[in-house]
Amino acid sequence: MTSQIRQNYSPEVEAAVNHLVNLHLRASYTYLSLGFYFDRDDVALEGVSHFFRELAEEKREAAERLLKMQNQRGGRALFQDVQKPSQDEWGKTLNAMEAALALEKNLNQALLDLHALGSAHTDPHLCDFLENHFLDEEVKLLKKMGDHLTNIRRLSGPQASLGEYLFERLTLKHD
């Protein structure tokens, strides 16, 4: 059944929004895995755990925001299987933050691709929505993760475990 409110909302954009929803849910699932990995008794980095669990919640909320926009435009939400995280053991904070940065770069590229698709289909509502709710937030998160990686690398070396502990205590307790 077609929507009675649908106007200037191309099937390609609708499919790309559904794909982006899936990417956000996958990111949320990955961050949940990361968060609870760092919460384990043999890892015990509470600040790192909290950082990733907050990201899991933010990505789930972003998926819901996209789904709400999809409905408002007369599109249909088509749910896909959410791929499990690429691993269960994340190693050190450095490895986890590198994986998270790669994930965010992938999400950012998908957002940019959707924005370009919206522009190509002359969809100002979609472009405005992405600019106001996603693009700036994503750039800020990429910068924050890059800064965290720089600081983690500074603390790496012969006593990397101490550096990881200090990073967690001095940086993530204040996020």
Curated annotation (Swiss-Prot):
<dbReference type="GO" id="GO:0070288">
    <property type="term" value="C:ferritin complex"/>
</dbReference>
<feature type="binding site">
    <location>
        <position position="58"/>
    </location>
    <ligand>
        <name>Fe cation</name>
    </ligand>
</feature>
<feature type="binding site">
    <location>
        <position position="54"/>
    </location>
    <ligand>
        <name>Fe cation</name>
    </ligand>
</feature>
<keyword id="KW-0968">Cytoplasmic vesicle</keyword>
<comment type="subunit">
    <text>Oligomer of 24 subunits. There are two types of subunits: L (light) chain and H (heavy) chain. The major chain can be light or heavy, depending on the species and tissue type. The functional molecule forms a roughly spherical shell with a diameter of 12 nm and contains a central cavity into which the insoluble mineral iron core is deposited. Interacts with NCOA4.</text>
</comment>
<comment type="function">
    <text>Stores iron in a soluble, non-toxic, readily available form. Important for iron homeostasis. Iron is taken up in the ferrous form and deposited as ferric hydroxides after oxidation. Also plays a role in delivery of iron to cells. Mediates iron uptake in capsule cells of the developing kidney. Delivery to lysosomes by the cargo receptor NCOA4 for autophagic degradation and release or iron.</text>
</comment>
<dbReference type="GO" id="GO:0031410">
    <property type="term" value="C:cytoplasmic vesicle"/>
</dbReference>
<keyword id="KW-0458">Lysosome</keyword>
<dbReference type="InterPro" id="IPR012347">
    <property type="entry name" value="Ferritin-like"/>
</dbReference>
<dbReference type="GO" id="GO:0008198">
    <property type="term" value="F:ferrous iron binding"/>
</dbReference>
<feature type="binding site">
    <location>
        <position position="57"/>
    </location>
    <ligand>
        <name>Fe cation</name>
    </ligand>
</feature>
<keyword id="KW-0409">Iron storage</keyword>
<keyword id="KW-0963">Cytoplasm</keyword>
<dbReference type="GO" id="GO:0006879">
    <property type="term" value="P:intracellular iron ion homeostasis"/>
</dbReference>
<feature type="domain" description="Ferritin-like diiron">
    <location>
        <begin position="7"/>
        <end position="156"/>
    </location>
</feature>
<dbReference type="InterPro" id="IPR014034">
    <property type="entry name" value="Ferritin_CS"/>
</dbReference>
<dbReference type="InterPro" id="IPR009078">
    <property type="entry name" value="Ferritin-like_SF"/>
</dbReference>
<dbReference type="Pfam" id="PF00210">
    <property type="entry name" value="Ferritin"/>
</dbReference>
<dbReference type="GO" id="GO:0008199">
    <property type="term" value="F:ferric iron binding"/>
</dbReference>
<dbReference type="InterPro" id="IPR001519">
    <property type="entry name" value="Ferritin"/>
</dbReference>
<dbReference type="InterPro" id="IPR008331">
    <property type="entry name" value="Ferritin_DPS_dom"/>
</dbReference>
<comment type="similarity">
    <text>Belongs to the ferritin family.</text>
</comment>
<feature type="binding site">
    <location>
        <position position="61"/>
    </location>
    <ligand>
        <name>Fe cation</name>
    </ligand>
</feature>
<dbReference type="GO" id="GO:0005776">
    <property type="term" value="C:autophagosome"/>
</dbReference>
<dbReference type="GO" id="GO:0044754">
    <property type="term" value="C:autolysosome"/>
</dbReference>
<keyword id="KW-0408">Iron</keyword>
<keyword id="KW-0479">Metal-binding</keyword>
<dbReference type="GO" id="GO:0005506">
    <property type="term" value="F:iron ion binding"/>
</dbReference>
<dbReference type="GO" id="GO:0006826">
    <property type="term" value="P:iron ion transport"/>
</dbReference>
<dbReference type="InterPro" id="IPR009040">
    <property type="entry name" value="Ferritin-like_diiron"/>
</dbReference>
<feature type="binding site">
    <location>
        <position position="64"/>
    </location>
    <ligand>
        <name>Fe cation</name>
    </ligand>
</feature>
<protein>
    <recommendedName>
        <fullName>Ferritin light chain</fullName>
    </recommendedName>
</protein>
